[in-house]
């Protein structure tokens, strides 16, 4: 990427984050049940279902445990009112690989994983009269219980559910102490319309529109560069005569391809070497970029609202003359980011993450620019291939989707922060709807370019490109969530839908209007004229 007048260190950190954020550009539903990679067979063709295991100890309700149903056996009810509350008992022997000496009739049996096949455990529990079987895993994962190749006749008519090791040990300990344990198994449906996804859809579109219109409708017309950063004042006329001297990264076609290659290498590094310390490194970088973005947005907004705020300055060592408002806002932004990092696992932490992320993306979309559609085609086409490869094709090579594994933080236990996310408030399974920064910034660069082109060409709202590209992005993002729904929540490469709906749309519109040549070469003549000037 080519840079023009690059002078500020925090902005360099924001660009580094732009490289990092590409690792989270797959929309993913981390809490969905997953049938991929485990083909069904005759008599063993149930769809895997997440199961809620509601439990009571001596009549007192405990914490709901989430389990996973098997490929075989009966399905658990969808409605809690159809699920029966049943007493549970430990199988004896605990592995349930031979006839139990404890009474299982009309009980839900609890057995330990191991020593024999899952189908064998289920048949023995069923023969003993059990009405269900809970299998305690040997770790916290929910292992997919399938049939073995030797199972030729499977006639299991009771539900079989895998539960995590910690929950199983707790249940076993209570039963060993003589407590009465009751359980209720059910698997509620997710809502057809996910309102949280609608809110996320609005946030993503709003971020792009806000970033595109920011300079004209938010930034002051006559504003000193000092509002933007703690920078030295270059001269008495630096604010008005050198406004274009602010940092702008104009992306080149070659730089776009290199960027995607570097992002791919970085994604592989995250996939293989992601750990808790690596996550902390990403968190620190995200906080730096978020502080920079929030500082720029707040100072710009306040200066726009209160003109006098942009007049008071103070002399600082090294920085020289800077706005007093800028100095006062830096601690607020820093404290905000630190508090988010400390409480990032809290239920409300998504609010702070989204605020920092939106501010960062608005700032990046002000700083990085596409000069024309030629460069946009190189960048978005490469990003399109990148997204599709690392989500859909990488499982054929790495046995799992690299993009989704990195976004979920499978190797570190924590998702990367370069995501906008909203809790599923109306989903009985909880979880988050997420969208990676790359799915907003890459198309956002093109939408912002279309607005600049419309302004330079003095076009109206309907005969320009900005409105139609905004609508195209909205449609593309809608198609992404529709694909998520149709694919049962399996992660989708959002750019698969967003690139055709934005880049494809502007190319078709430009060709139809006879303006494709102007869009393709926009800015090149101006650049050549600048180079020829003494």
Curated annotation (Swiss-Prot):
Principal location class: membrane
GO biological process, one term: membrane protein proteolysis
GO MF annotation terms: aspartic endopeptidase activity, intramembrane cleaving
KW Cell membrane (keyword) present: no
Topology versus the membrane: Multi-pass membrane protein
Cytoplasmic side: 220-250, 300-321, 369-377, 450-465, 513-534
UniProt cross-references to Gene3D superfamilies, sorted A to Z: 3.50.30.30
Lumenal side: 28-198, 274-276, 343-347, 399-428, 487-491
Subcellular localization, as worded in the UniProt entry: Endosome membrane
This protein's record includes keyword 4Fe-4S: no
Listed SUPFAM superfamilies: PA domain
UniProt-listed Enzyme Commission number(s): 3.4.23.-
Positions of transmembrane segments: 199-219, 251-273, 277-299, 322-342, 348-368, 378-398, 429-449, 466-486, 492-512
Domain of life: Eukaryota
Motif, PAL: chain positions: 493-495
Catalytic site: 387, 439
Family: Belongs to the peptidase A22B family.
Function: Intramembrane-cleaving aspartic protease (I-CLiP) that cleaves type II membrane signal peptides in the hydrophobic plane of the membrane.
PANTHER family in the cross-refs: SIGNAL PEPTIDE PEPTIDASE, SIGNAL PEPTIDE PEPTIDASE-LIKE 3
Domain writeup: The PAL motif is required for normal active site conformation.
Name of the molecule in the record: Signal peptide peptidase-like 2
């Amino acid at each position: 990427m080519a840079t023009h007048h690059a002078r500020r260190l925090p902005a360099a950190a924001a660009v580094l984050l732009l490289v990092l954020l590409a690792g989270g550009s797959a929309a993913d539903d981390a809490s969905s049940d997953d049938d991929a990679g485990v083909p069904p067979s005759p008599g063993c063709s149930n769809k895997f279902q997440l199961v809620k295991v509601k439990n009571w100890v001596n009549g007192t309700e405990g914490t709901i445990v989430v389990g996973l149903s098997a490929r075989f056996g009966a399905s658990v009810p969808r409605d809690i009112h159809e699920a029966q509350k049943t007493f549970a008992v430990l199988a004896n022997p605990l592995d349930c690989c031979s006839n139990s000496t404890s009474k299982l009739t009309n009980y839900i049996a609890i057995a330990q994983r191991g020593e024999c096949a899952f189908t064998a455990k289920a048949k023995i529990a069923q023969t003993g009269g059990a009405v269900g079987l809970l299998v305690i895993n040997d770790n916290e994962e929910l292992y997919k219980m399938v049939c073995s190749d030797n199972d030729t006749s499977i006639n299991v008519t009771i539900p079989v559910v895998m539960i995590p090791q910690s929950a199983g040990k707790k249940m076993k300990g209570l039963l060993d102490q003589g407590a009465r344990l009751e359980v209720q198994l059910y698997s509620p449906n997710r809502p057809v319309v996910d309102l949280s996804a609608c809110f996320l859809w609005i946030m993503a579109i709003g971020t792009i529109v806000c970033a595109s219109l920011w300079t004209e409708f938010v930034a002051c017309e006559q504003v000193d560069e000092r509002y933007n950063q703690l920078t030295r004042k270059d001269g008495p006329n630096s604010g008005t005569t050198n406004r274009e001297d602010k940092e702008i990264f104009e992306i080149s076609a070659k730089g776009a391809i290199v960027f995607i290659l570097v992002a791919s290498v970085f994604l592989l590094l995250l996939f293989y070497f992601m750990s808790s310390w690596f996550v902390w490194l990403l968190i620190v970088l995200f906080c730096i970029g978020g502080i920079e973005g929030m500082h720029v947005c707040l100072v710009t907004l306040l200066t726009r609202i209160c003109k006098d705020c942009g007049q008071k300055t103070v002399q600082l060592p090294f920085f020289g003359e800077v706005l007093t408002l800028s100095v006062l806002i830096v601690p607020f932004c820093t404290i905000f980011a630190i508090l988010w990092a400390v409480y990032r696992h809290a239920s409300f932490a998504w609010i702070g993450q989204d605020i920092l992320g939106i501010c960062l993306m608005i700032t990046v979309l002000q700083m990085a620019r596409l000069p024309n559609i030629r460069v946009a085609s190189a960048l978005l086409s490469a990003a399109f291939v990148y997204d599709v490869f690392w989500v859909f094709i990488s499982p054929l090579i790495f046995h799992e989707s690299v993009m989704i594994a990195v976004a979920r933080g499978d190797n570190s236990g924590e998702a990367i922060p370069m995501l906008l996310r909203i809790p599923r408030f109306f989903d009985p399974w909880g979880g988050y709807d997420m969208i990676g920064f790359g799915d907003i910034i890459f198309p956002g660069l093109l939408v912002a370019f279309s607005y600049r082109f419309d302004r330079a060409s003095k076009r109206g709202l309907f005969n320009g490109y900005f409105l139609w590209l905004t609508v195209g992005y909205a449609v593309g993002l809608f198609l992404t969530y529709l694909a998520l729904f149709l694919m049962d929540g399996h992660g989708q490469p959002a750019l698969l839908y967003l690139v055709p709906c934005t880049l494809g749309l502007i190319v078709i519109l430009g060709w139809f209007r006879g303006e494709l040549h102007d869009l393709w070469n926009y800015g090149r003549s101006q650049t050549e004229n600048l180079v020829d000037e003494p």
